[in-house]
Swiss-Prot record:
Similarity comment: Belongs to the eukaryotic ribosomal protein eS24 family.
Annotated gene: rps24e
Disulfide-bonded cysteines: none
PROSITE patterns linked to this entry: RIBOSOMAL_S24E (PS00529)
Protein name: Small ribosomal subunit protein eS24
Keywords in alphabetical order: Ribonucleoprotein, Ribosomal protein
InterPro entries for the chain: eRP_eS24_sf, Ribosomal_eS24, Ribosomal_eS24_CS, Ribosomal_uL23/eL15/eS24_sf
Lineage: Archaea, Thermoproteota, Thermoprotei, Sulfolobales, Sulfolobaceae
Length: 118
């Protein structure tokens, strides 16, 4: 069994990579991470993106946090993260709303006000 990769998110939050799958077809690395944050809240997506980008020596805009799940009161979270090799693959495969969440951008939806303007 290979060595587990440790991720330090902050002073109170650390994690380990439980599964690391190299997906060559999608040109990405799929990570399943177990986060320990006992005594503090669930880490934010931005904190996770920064920590994962620094751990795997990649740009922050190539990291997409798919999901973060925490059981009530446990202090342990599970995160599902994709780390892409290039921006083109990320744009083709990930939904725009997820890309916007991780970068902090607001993506306008084409609601009723957008239809009235046309």
């Amino acid at each position: 069994m290979s060595q587990q990769i440790k991720i330090k998110v902050s002073d109170k939050v650390e994690g380990i990579v439980e599964r690391d799958i190299q997906n060559n077809v999608a040109n990405r690395r799929e990570l399943y991470i177990k986060l320990f944050h006992i005594g503090s809240g669930t880490p934010s997506r931005k904190e996770l993106v920064k920590a994962i980008a620094s751990t795997f020596s990649t740009a922050e805009d190539l990291v997409v946090v798919k999901k973060v799940f925490t059981n009530y009161g446990s202090g342990i979270s599970y995160a599902r993260v994709n780390v892409y090799k290039d921006k083109d693959s990320l744009q083709k495969l990930e939904p725009q709303y997820l890309i916007g969440r991780d970068t902090g951008q607001k993506i306008k939806k084409g609601g009723k006000s957008a239809q009235k303007q046309q």
